[in-house]
Amino acid sequence: MNKSINNLQDIFLNNARKERIPVTIFLVNGVQLKGIVKGFDSFTVVLDSDGKQQLVYKHAISTVSPAKPILFNNAQVFDN
């Protein structure tokens, strides 16, 4: 069995990054951060907001809301 099954979180963030879709990140404390996803790993997201970079820890994120729908197909989600 192929162990390269992509998870939805990675696909979502990667498409937001590649397409440079503006996102609003809502933190668990209510703070809103707006910007472009520049990169991410298992624990953090790097957000570019007006030329300033912010490293946001995923455990502090409640919601990521894109400015427009992020399109992906089932082939990205499920590796046959």
Swiss-Prot record:
Please name the Pfam families in this protein's record. Hfq (PF17209)
Cite the GO molecular-function annotations of the record: RNA binding
Taken from the UniProt record, the cysteine pairs bridged by disulfide bonds within this chain are none
Supply the Gene3D superfamilies for this chain: 2.30.30.100
One GO CC annotation = cytosol
Q: Which UniProt keywords apply?
A: RNA-binding, Stress response
Could you tell me which InterPro entries the record lists for this protein?
Hfq (IPR005001), LSM_dom_sf (IPR010920), Sm (IPR047575)
Q: Which GO terms describe its biological process?
A: regulation of DNA-templated transcription; regulation of RNA stability; regulation of translation, ncRNA-mediated
What SUPFAM superfamilies does the entry give? Sm-like ribonucleoproteins
Sm domain: from which residue to which, for each copy?
Answer: 10-70
What the protein does? RNA chaperone that binds small regulatory RNA (sRNAs) and mRNAs to facilitate mRNA translational regulation in response to envelope stress, environmental stress and changes in metabolite concentrations. Also binds with high specificity to tRNAs.
Q: How does it assemble?
A: Homohexamer.
So what family is this one in?
Belongs to the Hfq family.
Q: Which NCBIfam families match?
A: Hfq (TIGR02383), PRK00395.1 (NF001602)
For this entry, the protein name equals RNA-binding protein Hfq
From which organism does this entry originate? Clostridium perfringens (strain 13 / Type A)
**Taxon lineage:** Bacteria, Bacillati, Bacillota, Clostridia, Eubacteriales
Which gene underlies this protein?
hfq
